[in-house]
Amino acid sequence: MQEAYIVSTARTPIGRFGGGLKEFSPSDLGAHVMKAILQRANIPGDALDMYIFGNVLRAGHGQLIPRQAAVKAGIPQTIDGYAVDMVCSSGMMSVMNATMMIKSGEADLVLAGGMESMSQAGFFLSHRARWGYKFLLGKPEQLKDVLEYDGLTDPIEDEGMGSETERLAAEYGITREEVDEVAYYSHKRAAEATAQGIFKTEIAPVEVKTRKGTTLLDEDEGIRPDTTPESLAKLRPAFTSDGILTAGNASQISDGAAALLIANDAAIKRYDLTPIARIIGGSWAAVDSWRFAEAPIPAVRKLAAKHKLDVADFDLVENNEAFAVNTILMNRELGVPTEKLNIYGSGISLGHPIGCTGARLIVTLLTGLQNEQGKLGLASLCHGMGGGTAVAVERL
């Protein structure tokens, strides 16, 4: 079994919903990080064996969005690739699939990541529109929101993920004060990291054309440095009338892309690459669909057991803040201390472009390990319909 190494990373700044990246399609965003990572690694596109990218909200954007992105990035059309849809875990599973290709000897060099434009998610009519409406009496046709229907709703329970998380929070006895505290520290940490220039090594700035000219977007748009516990406490519940979750302690709807270049020893020697980290392995697990926020817990336990590790062995942990509840569960159930968890913020402050985040977490984890001189890192996240994934890395 061969080893798989991360040799380069890149991500876009994360754009707010309807913000600076709203005119960029998912393939535009993907192309940007593909091009950036090849430039950073100083290799041609034809060196790749494959590209694998996560994407969820693809309706109306055409066939095989990662291949569209690759062509835009100048990767030769003789290099093929595919998309992964595992909802929020899409980007992470893309990295895991690339790792499996490398370790099995099927590929030497694979580009993996995720891309999502939640701002460009459209609306759709049901199949009834194709065959004609004979009568609408009693059966009105409504436009459905692709973002809500394909991205944020559990079809098994026919329930939004926010209200499902409210149910889980009630079961665990999680309070409004606890989730607001998570949100406060998320913004505080992200704002401090941005002010210190920590994300500059990750972000490939994007030129944004406006009526006033061209501007350079080089920072994440969703961070609110002025967030306080008092301002969070004033927000109304977002999903249930008496709930604890608000727009302030749930992840942001966002746009963005992230990529990692994964290589074996042969590719490293052939192209004179410098490995950043070794991918120890990945895992996945699933629970009842409405309990999705719990799913990273068994995924992490499975990963740790397989590689004879303890959760305490990891120097840093990135677990996506789909909701602040996720952070509390990682702390309570796995014993991850807050000083190791999401040290630069996460989905609440940085944003959560769903098909991208799984890859973005690994990119940011590597930044943290480098800055903190840590050795072992863990990235994990939940995904809609009850699943979760986890990846462990060793910084070199």
Each language-model region and where it sits:
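Condensing-enzyme catalytic core mediating Claisen C-C bond formation in acyl metabolism
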Residues: M1-S25, L143, P229-E294, P298, ...
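N-terminal extracellular/periplasmic Venus flytrap/periplasmic-binding protein-like
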Residues: R11-T12, K22-H32, R40, E178-D265, ...
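Conserved beta-ketoacyl condensing-enzyme motif
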Residues: K22-V110, M115-K134, I203-D218, W290, ...
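Short, well-ordered amphipathic alpha-helical segments that serve as non-catalytic structural scaffolds
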Residues: P26-N42, I65-A69, S94, M161-L168, ...
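Conserved catalytic cysteine-centered active-site region
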Residues: N55-V110, Q142-K144, P155-M161, D226-Q252, ...
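Active-site-proximal alpha-helical scaffold in enzymes
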Residues: M86-E116, A169-I198, A259-A266, N331-R332, ...
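Flexible glycine-/small-residue-enriched beta->alpha junction loops
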Residues: L109-R167
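Active-site pocket-lining segment
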Residues: E164-E166, F199-E202, K209-T210, I280-S349
